[in-house]
Amino acid sequence: MKNLTGLCNLPAGDIHTLLDLAAVFKKRLVTPDPSFSVTLQNKRIALVFFENSTRTRFSFDIAARHLGGSTLSFSASGSSVSKGESLGDTIRNLEAMQVDAFVLRHASSGAADFIAGITAKTVINAGDGSHEHPTQALLDIFTLREHFGAVKGLNIVILGDVLHSRVARSNIFGLKTLGANVAVCGPATLLFSDTSHLGVSIFTDLDKAIEWADAALVLRLQLERATGGYLPSLEEYSTHFGLNDERLERVRKHLLVLHPGPINREIEISNNVADRIQPPGYSKSMLLEQVSNGVAVRMAVLQTLLAG
């Protein structure tokens, strides 16, 4: 494997290999091993982010440093992009500086595949438009696998703005490849018009979705949707699709809750549900566990692509 631009066509064996390696790295992060080799020494990794990021950018930075690599942080606002330089020219110039890999986030769907087509260096997609976000999905799947022991046969509902979500797409591809049952839930205006090619079920009633699901992946509601004609109001969305204690207690179903962040508290998810990591209650939040797992998963991706 040379690049990771998406999970759409990634075989189950490759996903399992990455998750198994991530499990090894997670143990080493908890219990440091002095014999652990820094396999990315002298490797330069460019973090090329054309969109804002906290978790993904810092996670890749920390992952690379754990493996002995060095990172170069790129900000579009402080670069020649602000003077009109194209994405392709930016990448070619960084490549000329002997960068070994590009971790790319861009607003345009397909940007990562475009870059992979013009450079001989490794390309990792850190989110491109509404297309894919493969490492986020891998860490979500890793979190589920750690909790349940396996992903195959699980019922996973993806809740919220599925239509515009790269996280949703990558999770659907990865979860389906590993044998999970996947459903989406949200207002009809924020769901796919046709899901036959994806093999997912559709719920427009959140209570029924919770009854069916073992875990819920709650997506960030992009607040501009309320003014873009997709939603009557944020209050209306929260009433019908917000995940809160009242709804969970009504259904009386214990649910594992994931969220890629950042969170719109009291809109897509309540404070109690977002922060609950111990009972009592009908849910368990994995939000911070996801963030921790992201470092190990991205270490596995970097190791596999650059030193494997």
UniProtKB/Swiss-Prot annotation:
<dbReference type="InterPro" id="IPR006130">
    <property type="entry name" value="Asp/Orn_carbamoylTrfase"/>
</dbReference>
<dbReference type="Pfam" id="PF00185">
    <property type="entry name" value="OTCace"/>
</dbReference>
<keyword id="KW-0808">Transferase</keyword>
<comment type="function">
    <text>Catalyzes the condensation of carbamoyl phosphate and aspartate to form carbamoyl aspartate and inorganic phosphate, the committed step in the de novo pyrimidine nucleotide biosynthesis pathway.</text>
</comment>
<dbReference type="GO" id="GO:0016597">
    <property type="term" value="F:amino acid binding"/>
</dbReference>
<dbReference type="InterPro" id="IPR002082">
    <property type="entry name" value="Asp_carbamoyltransf"/>
</dbReference>
<comment type="pathway">
    <text>Pyrimidine metabolism; UMP biosynthesis via de novo pathway; (S)-dihydroorotate from bicarbonate: step 2/3.</text>
</comment>
<feature type="binding site">
    <location>
        <position position="55"/>
    </location>
    <ligand>
        <name>carbamoyl phosphate</name>
    </ligand>
</feature>
<dbReference type="InterPro" id="IPR036901">
    <property type="entry name" value="Asp/Orn_carbamoylTrfase_sf"/>
</dbReference>
<feature type="binding site">
    <location>
        <position position="56"/>
    </location>
    <ligand>
        <name>carbamoyl phosphate</name>
    </ligand>
</feature>
<dbReference type="GO" id="GO:0006520">
    <property type="term" value="P:amino acid metabolic process"/>
</dbReference>
<feature type="binding site">
    <location>
        <position position="83"/>
    </location>
    <ligand>
        <name>L-aspartate</name>
    </ligand>
</feature>
<dbReference type="GO" id="GO:0005829">
    <property type="term" value="C:cytosol"/>
</dbReference>
<feature type="binding site">
    <location>
        <position position="166"/>
    </location>
    <ligand>
        <name>L-aspartate</name>
    </ligand>
</feature>
<feature type="binding site">
    <location>
        <position position="133"/>
    </location>
    <ligand>
        <name>carbamoyl phosphate</name>
    </ligand>
</feature>
<feature type="binding site">
    <location>
        <position position="261"/>
    </location>
    <ligand>
        <name>carbamoyl phosphate</name>
    </ligand>
</feature>
<feature type="binding site">
    <location>
        <position position="262"/>
    </location>
    <ligand>
        <name>carbamoyl phosphate</name>
    </ligand>
</feature>
<keyword id="KW-0665">Pyrimidine biosynthesis</keyword>
<feature type="binding site">
    <location>
        <position position="220"/>
    </location>
    <ligand>
        <name>L-aspartate</name>
    </ligand>
</feature>
<dbReference type="GO" id="GO:0044205">
    <property type="term" value="P:'de novo' UMP biosynthetic process"/>
</dbReference>
<dbReference type="InterPro" id="IPR006132">
    <property type="entry name" value="Asp/Orn_carbamoyltranf_P-bd"/>
</dbReference>
<feature type="binding site">
    <location>
        <position position="136"/>
    </location>
    <ligand>
        <name>carbamoyl phosphate</name>
    </ligand>
</feature>
<protein>
    <recommendedName>
        <fullName>Aspartate carbamoyltransferase catalytic subunit</fullName>
        <ecNumber>2.1.3.2</ecNumber>
    </recommendedName>
</protein>
<comment type="similarity">
    <text>Belongs to the aspartate/ornithine carbamoyltransferase superfamily. ATCase family.</text>
</comment>
<dbReference type="InterPro" id="IPR006131">
    <property type="entry name" value="Asp_carbamoyltransf_Asp/Orn-bd"/>
</dbReference>
<dbReference type="GO" id="GO:0006207">
    <property type="term" value="P:'de novo' pyrimidine nucleobase biosynthetic process"/>
</dbReference>
<dbReference type="GO" id="GO:0004070">
    <property type="term" value="F:aspartate carbamoyltransferase activity"/>
</dbReference>
<comment type="subunit">
    <text>Heterododecamer (2C3:3R2) of six catalytic PyrB chains organized as two trimers (C3), and six regulatory PyrI chains organized as three dimers (R2).</text>
</comment>
<dbReference type="Pfam" id="PF02729">
    <property type="entry name" value="OTCace_N"/>
</dbReference>
<feature type="binding site">
    <location>
        <position position="105"/>
    </location>
    <ligand>
        <name>carbamoyl phosphate</name>
    </ligand>
</feature>
